[in-house]
Amino acid sequence: MAQIASVRGPIDTAELGSTLMHEHVFVLSTEILENYGGDWWDEEVRVTDGVQKLTALVERGITTIVDPTVIGLGRYIPRVQRINEQVPGLNIIVATGLYTFDELPHYFGYRGPGTLLEGPELLADLFISDIRDGIAGTGVKAAFLKCVVEEKGMTPGIERVARAVAATHRETGVPITVHTNAAHETGTLALDLFEAEGVDLTKVVLGHSGDSNDLEYLRRLMDRGPPSAWTASGWTCSTPPPSGWRPSPLWLRRATPTAWSWPTMRPVTWTTSAGQPPRTS
């Protein structure tokens, strides 16, 4: 039986059960939290809240969540471990990668081939270490990769992360999920780069593609081979009315009758806490 890494160790894929494919236990701005969170962040309260919410999820029949929280989204595995210890009925699958809409964090931007400080490419080495050795001494191994291609497209920083993700995929075989911007059709850019880099496109998930009601765009993505062609929160923020967010089931209603051969994912894109201070007005 094939196995997959989880927060509580390797598990047989047969044990995954009902799975939500794109959920965040926490999304945090770590430096803001550490420097300014004292008045509004209580670690014990947030952990307890996370335990309660994930326990409720298990009670509704969910046995696995796939958490694409990586560097840039406040990944901190010890906190997730604490919660998972208290929700033993839930498997949590975690990721490695880097989340940025444009430029790299300065640490990486100044290090690597062609940068001010030169040196080897660090990103792929770090991603591979997270998968093979575990994340930050926790022993928890990443099971998939995460990157972003947003509105600005394949900027130098975005391209460098994406190529490091592709290199890691070739080395380890783990799948990839990409945050895309459906309004700007950046899923196409992601597939173009990954195809050129020799990535197995059947192991690529194009996240948030369901934010679009453009069925031709969605069909073009799926016709290129990814069996899990989009994730969607059921809302559109890329093509909304001026007033804000709205439910976006149109693509699902129109695509479903003709798309039974296109396996899709429809997760919630949910978090127990985004680490925001309370509103004061």
Residue ranges and their predicted role:
Residues 166, 170-250, 260:
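Catalytic pocket-lining loop regions of alpha/beta-barrel enzymes
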Residues 24-26, 70-71, 95-101, 150, ...:
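Active-site beta-loop-alpha junctions enriched in small/polar residues
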Residues 22, 65, 169, 228, ...:
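Divalent metal-coordination and catalytic microenvironments
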Residues 82, 86, 91-175, 227, ...:
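Active-site gating/metal-coordination segments in enzymes
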